[in-house]
A protein has these predicted regions:
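ABC transporter nucleotide-binding domain
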Residues: 96-185
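Helix N-cap at the start of a conserved alpha-helix in ABC-type nucleotide-binding domains
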Residues: 91-93
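Short, small-residue-biased leader/transition segments that mark boundaries at the very start
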Residues: 1-8
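C-terminal coupling/interaction segments
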Residues: 183-222
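Short loop immediately C-terminal to the Walker-B catalytic DE motif
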Residues: 86-87, 119
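ABC-family P-loop ATPase nucleotide-binding domains
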Residues: 11-67
């Protein structure tokens, strides 16, 4: 029906018309969304330093992607679904949008469901974290706790020696006299466990992880 068609138009995505300018495409889409908020769109355009009269056809792929995302934000929806939103964005534009999206969602109370293959993008957006491996939950905790507690460890060991088998040591490897593993234990706790197994830990060192490193440490590199 016509009524149903109108509802779908308000909830579906958009088509980008390259012959339009920044201002023209905003005016065009504003007709179809009753909760349209042009400020959300133009706020992002100002950060991109693009003029309202600039034609989309003359913009880079990254800028065009940001225009598309700005049009989505302007719809002022209660729920936004962004599937692989970072495709086509270089690191600078990606970070700009992530920070803009974070502030947008917090100020409006908007629910945002998003997917991304770039895990570090999530660090600025999430409060709680669930890491799964083939349907099995490995970790469920606040993201700050995961990044604050889970660390990588490295030390020199005798050729042919092996780390002790312990559930506290995640993804242990020993190659060429170097051992690496991940753990939620503190450096003092790890050192005590190694000494108990008869392994010298004078060369033991630990390193804090970002979210991507933590994910690899929990699930494996491949």
């Amino acid at each position: 029906s016509s009524a149903a068609s109108d509802v779908y138009k308000r909830q579906e995505g958009h088509v980008q018309y390259a012959f339009m300018t920044i201002r023209e495409i905003e005016r065009f889409y504003s007709q179809y969304y009753p909760r349209w908020d042009a400020r959300a769109y133009y706020g992002l355009m100002e950060l991109l330093a693009v003029a309202p009269g600039q034609r989309i056809a003359r913009m880079s792929c990254g800028q065009r992607s940001q225009v598309a995302l700005g049009l989505i934000l302007a719809q002022n929806a209660d729920l936004m679904i962004l599937d692989d939103f970072s495709m086509g964005l270089d690191p600078g534009y990606r970070r700009l949008f992530v920070e803009y999206l974070r502030d947008y969602a917090r100020s409006r109370g908007t629910t945002v469901f998003l997917t991304s293959h770039i895990i570090q993008d999530m660090e600025k957006l999430i409060d709680d974290c669930i890491v799964m491996d083939y349907g099995r939950i490995l970790v469920q905790m606040p993201a700050g706790d995961l990044l604050g507690r889970f660390r990588s460890y490295e030390l020199a060991i005798a050729e042919g020696a092996a780390l002790p088998e312990a559930p506290e040591f995640h993804r242990p490897t020993a190659i060429g006299g170097r051992a690496e593993f991940y753990s939620f234990e503190t450096e003092a706790e790890v050192a005590a466990r190694l000494r108990q197994a008869g392994i010298a830990c004078d060369t033991l060192r630990s390193e804090a992880l970002n979210l991507e490193d933590a994910f690899i440490g929990l699930t494996g590199k491949y």
